[in-house]
Amino acid sequence: MIETTTLRFSHGDTTVLDGVDFTAETGDVTVLFGRNGAGKSTLLRHFNGLLEPDAGTVSVGGTPIAYDDDSLTELRLRVGLIFQNPDDQLVAPTVQQDIAFGPRNAGIEDTDRIEDVVSTFDLSEQAERLCNTLSGGEKKRVSLAGVLAMDPEYVLLDEPTAGLDGAGCRTIVEFVSSLAADGITTVIATHDVGFGLTVADTVTVLEDGVIDYRGDTLSQSLAAEYDLRSYVFDDWSDVSVE
């Protein structure tokens, strides 16, 4: 479980999160909706200690986050974060090196797992390619593979479908479905309501730094009130809506 209690965070004079009480149940896919600037990405970055709150607590697995270097290193082995821009994720020259970077940096030498992850994301033929020669969709797959190679307990995704076409978005849906099948607690920040409702077990809407709605689905009329749109999956026939 990931949980926050009266979480507050400001950037300069601007209050970004204002007393947020949030829960992501163990094994669930929790989708965090909100328009641009609502505070979604800021909240997500608190879950693996990239940001420290001004007030309130963040707990992962029932334990409040400690912000010393050793504790944060251990936390980030358990909680993988996939950034919106895959270029922020890629840290090594080639595909294979990038996917293996996280485990090796943590002292984990598991060649079989790395090879399995490379194969899972259909990257075997591109393993020696330079990351800076990849397309946006290919970079996204490498960033997903790099996080999965860490064998995390929790996965956080920030706007994972941004800039992707339909095929790329389906890759993300399949990835999230595989996380759910493996019982990995997943939190996704997005303003793409079609994608979000396709994968969500539970839904939270963040509005102006506060949680404005919780539920297991979201009606189209309510989505419109929050200015949420479906950018790729125009047909909602397979999506549970009220």
UniProtKB/Swiss-Prot annotation:
GO terms for cellular component: ATP-binding cassette (ABC) transporter complex. Belongs to the ABC transporter superfamily. It is a peripheral membrane protein. It comes from the Archaea. Residues 2-233 form the ABC transporter domain. Probably part of an ABC transporter complex. Responsible for energy coupling to the transport system. This is Putative ABC transporter ATP-binding protein VNG_1631G. It holds the Pfam family ABC_tran. The keyword Nucleotide-binding applies. One of its GO terms (biological process) is cobalt ion transport. GO terms for molecular function: ATP binding; ATP hydrolysis activity; ATPase-coupled transmembrane transporter activity. Its main location: membrane. PROSITE patterns: ABC_TRANSPORTER_1, ABC_TRANSPORTER_2. It comes from Halobacterium salinarum (strain ATCC 700922 / JCM 11081 / NRC-1). ATP binds at G34, R35, N36, G37, A38, G39, K40, S41.
